[in-house]
Amino acid sequence: MELDQNATEKVKAMFTAIDELLYEQKPSVHTQSLQKECQQWASSFPHLRILGRQIITSSEGYGLYPRSPSAVSASHEAILPQERESTIFGIRGKKLHFSSSYKASPSTKASGSSADGEEADCIIFSEGIIEEYLAFDHTDMEEGFHGNKSEAATEKQKLGYPPIAPFYCMKEDVLAYVFDNVWSKAVGCMEQLTRSHWEGFASDDESNVEITRLDSGSPYMLNEQQPLVLPRVPQSKVMSVTSNPMNFCQASGHQPNVNGLLIHGMPLQPRNLSLMDKLLDLDDKLLMRPGSSSVLSNRNWPNRAMELSTSSLSYTTQSARRRNPPPRTLHPISTSHSRTGTPWPAEEILRGPRLPMTADSLSSPSPMTMGRNNLLPPIGTADVEHLSILGSQRPTKPHGDSSRARSAAVDEPNQQPQERLLLPVFSRPNTTQSFLPETQYRSSCASECPHHARPGRGSAGPQSHGSTKPQSRGGPISRTRQ
């Protein structure tokens, strides 16, 4: 600690001697070498002058920053021109107090108003905490061009600094405001030109425009946001959307294998979809009437059978989502199209193993492919008789249990014979299968019918029919009404 204190005192005494030599011209033992060095500097650089005095160190929080040394030296040359000598190292200045450091000295006031203006413009006094932030406007660069502001502006743009000074910030704000107004007017003019150019090549057919606006099922119009005021669409763009109906159908979702089916009349698809929606809504209204396993689509519509077959494949994905959720109550049979009739054994018990899924049955289509909604067209009487044979074989299957069909036989004993012919095939709208091939019926019924034949109940249904047809592999004989 004593060594540090002694070293500090020696350094402090050295700086004090230097200050006395520079500002008070008091020689001492410690400043002899400094005097020799100053003489060498004065002889080598006769134009070098040291003016002013350091008031306080910059670490105290404030200090004086001269803008340009040339302006300060010029002001002092006007004050003391007679004391300047080329061979003498001159030090000129006055000792000021800290309280009045920011005020001008009396000698400075007597020098004239011009010198006061220059010193006030050239010296900046700052007090307080100085942040490390540099802001400059390159005023010296602008003064160097002598009034040529365009060249100075190009030089500033090359530097890449943002506008920092308040003047340039206001300038940028004004330019941005002017640009916004001009750009809004330009966009308005361009919008009018675009609309006029669009309407010039548009077609006069307004129905095509309505098709493109109202066709919500089109894959090309799903993600487009239509403006409030839409100009007329040209005929070429409308035809590009509606010209290829097969691509229009394939893009709507995954379609099953439709080899062997006759598909025609695809432009009628929107009408058929609306018809199927009405049928499904009618089914949903009748959910609160339990005790039946009939479907409203079992009615015979010979004129619309082909139309329904064209839309059944494309409607599979939509109907599956509405039919496959939780099991629902079965529908009634006694509708406006039903009539009274004798009971049938197939209405009482339906037993048998679960048939394969839709994807398995669709892989191998057959001529007897049948949908659950009676979507295939009626072909002839022979096929109806064949369906009756298949229907008479299914009640004898021993496996599984179907409470839906049992409830239908108990609650609704009087049914129409024509509806009972297709009841075993189309009476389960909530199951997973949608197409039941002929080979599966034959293989499952031929092995189980001989062991579980019921003559008492099997003779009740066929007595009301006219024509008979024997079965190919053995089993009960079914009759149909013509």
UniProtKB/Swiss-Prot annotation:
The keyword Isomerase does not apply. Residues 314-344, 356-379, 391-482 are annotated as: Disordered. It is found in: Cell projection, Cilium. One of its GO terms (cellular component) is cilium. GO terms for biological process: cilium assembly; protein localization to cilium. Keywords: Cell projection, Cilium, Cilium biogenesis/degradation. Residues 332-341, 428-446, 461-471 have a biased composition (Polar residues). Coiled coil: none annotated. Its main location: other. Disulfide bonds: none annotated. It holds the Pfam family DUF3719. Involved in the localization of proteins to the cilium and cilium assembly. Indirectly regulates the signaling functions of the cilium, being required for normal SHH/smoothened signaling and proper development. Belongs to the FAM149 family. Interacts with TBC1D32; may play a role in cilium assembly. This is Primary cilium assembly protein FAM149B1. It comes from Rattus norvegicus (Rat). The lineage of its organism: Eukaryota, Metazoa, Chordata, Craniata, Vertebrata.
